[in-house]
Amino acid sequence: MVKMNMTEKILAEAAGLREVTPGEIIEARVDLAMTHDGTSPPTIRTFRDIASRGGPARVWDPERIVMVFDHNVPANTIGAAEFQRVTREFAREQGIVNIFQNAAGICHQVLPERGFVRPGMVIVGADSHTCTYGAFGAFATGMGATDMAMVFATGKTWFMVPEAMRIEVTGEPEGHVYAKDVILHIIGEIGVDGATYRSVEFTGDTIESMDVSGRMTICNMAVEMGAKNGIMEPNRQTLDYVRARTGREFRVYSSDEDSQYLEDHHFDVSDLEPQVACPDDVDNVYPVHRVEGTHIDEAFLGSCTNGRYEDLKIAAEVIGDRRVHEDVRFIVSPASREIYLKALEDGIIETFIRAGAIVCNPGCGPCLGAHMGVLAPGEVSIATTNRNFRGRMGDPASSVYLANPAVVAESAIEGVISAPQQEAGNGC
């Protein structure tokens, strides 16, 4: 019998096969499909086109489709408002009740938080960072509107079974070193195309001990090295998180001991210092001391990568009772309403407001340069987001540095890229 890794086992089950091998083309059952306000309308148009050619006029299962408004919330243009209107009407017509509007949160936070994500699932999303759900032991990947329209119609999609890459992470980071630094370091070594169309499996004692927030950060950025998906075997914290949010059954898959990997990589992060991805590539990574003193105009704390409660708490502790630098716009956007409320209750939002930060509703706006913090020509941002290519957060002549929440918070205070000086416990 062929030895299989986690991804292969999940895909084999979804395809109704005993085993699959890399390079094999399969048709797989989809457990959950997600679109957001930017990708729902093109998916809907293609779905209707399929229906006009004799395809299904109704979605395969309205309970397995989730729609989230997060990219332009509240709508910042007439076009965005129209996209959202079209999506609302389609959801109403098709009986899709799982539609989250009015700044409920970023899709990749809302889905796990609301109990839609479980180990062993096949999840597809019309967004490249759908790979985030691999943190829960699911096979999750992004796709375009055409493929998603076929999923809406049939509940199935095709995959080429990916080659696998195993990344073992060991060691206990110290100080202000977190999951963001770990994944930036990995991408810096492997490169933005070093894992193209590969299933990246994260293992090792660092991953095993990492909390849910950190694990989501790692898997979220797997696509930034070209991966088809990132995946981890769920640890106890992850299983507790899932069970607290859903009573539905699930199956946890583990890789066979002798399963094959195209590549194996090992990273010891014991002595890692905070990392910064410099313009204009995510793999242009250096230790923070190499770029300290770089002027910034904006600091952004949020996104599906680092907008969780743990991230906000780290930043608030770094800020304390200090004030944001007078020349810096410090923008904070919690990843969901649930996170926002908890941060309010615990005084974290008050810390940001008293420091002079701009606290926005949950959403993706600043990350993709859509609204709530667009950069002008020549401006520089340091952000907890996942991409920094030219023009990502605004004008093509602007620049973006990526860093962890502590570095972003300290930089907002100092007005230049800075490493936190305060003592911190063990990272990750």
From Swiss-Prot:
Which Gene Ontology molecular-function terms are recorded? 3-isopropylmalate dehydratase activity; 4 iron, 4 sulfur cluster binding; homoaconitate hydratase activity; metal ion binding
Keywords from UniProt, A to Z, are: 4Fe-4S, Iron, Iron-sulfur, Lyase, Metal-binding
- InterPro entries from the UniProt entry: Acnase/IPM_dHydase_lsu_aba_1/3, Acoase/IPM_deHydtase_lsu_aba, Aconitase_4Fe-4S_BS, Aconitase_4Fe-4S_dom, HAcnase/IPMdehydase_lsu_prok, Homoacnase/IPMdehydase_lsu, IPM_dehydratase_rel_enz, IPMI_cat
Please name the PROSITE patterns in this protein's record: ACONITASE_1, ACONITASE_2
Q: Which residues bind [4Fe-4S] cluster?
A: 304, 364, 367
Catalytic activities: (2R)-homocitrate = (2R,3S)-homoisocitrate; (2R)-homocitrate = cis-homoaconitate + H2O; (2R,3S)-homoisocitrate = cis-homoaconitate + H2O; cis-(homo)2aconitate + H2O = (2R,3S)-iso(homo)2citrate
Biological or metabolic pathway of the protein: Organic acid metabolism; 2-oxosuberate biosynthesis
Q: What domain of life?
A: Archaea
Give the enzyme's EC designation. 4.2.1.114
- One annotated GO biological process: L-leucine biosynthetic process
Note the subunit structure: Heterotetramer of 2 HacA and 2 HacB proteins.
Q: Which family does it belong to?
A: Belongs to the aconitase/IPM isomerase family. LeuC type 2 subfamily.
Function of this protein? Answer: Component of a hydro-lyase with broad substrate specificity for cis-unsaturated tricarboxylic acids. Catalyzes both the reversible dehydration of (R)-homocitrate ((R)-2-hydroxybutane-1,2,4-tricarboxylate) to produce cis-homoaconitate ((Z)-but-1-ene-1,2,4-tricarboxylate), and its hydration to homoisocitrate ((1R,2S)-1-hydroxybutane-1,2,4-tricarboxylate). Is also able to hydrate the analogous longer chain substrates cis-homo(2)-aconitate, cis-homo(3)-aconitate. These reactions are part of the biosynthesis pathway of coenzyme B.
Concerning PANTHER family, the annotation shows: HOMOACONITASE, MITOCHONDRIAL, HOMOACONITASE, MITOCHONDRIAL-RELATED
Record protein name field: Probable methanogen homoaconitase large subunit
Give the species this sequence originates from.
Methanothermobacter thermautotrophicus (strain ATCC 29096 / DSM 1053 / JCM 10044 / NBRC 100330 / Delta H)
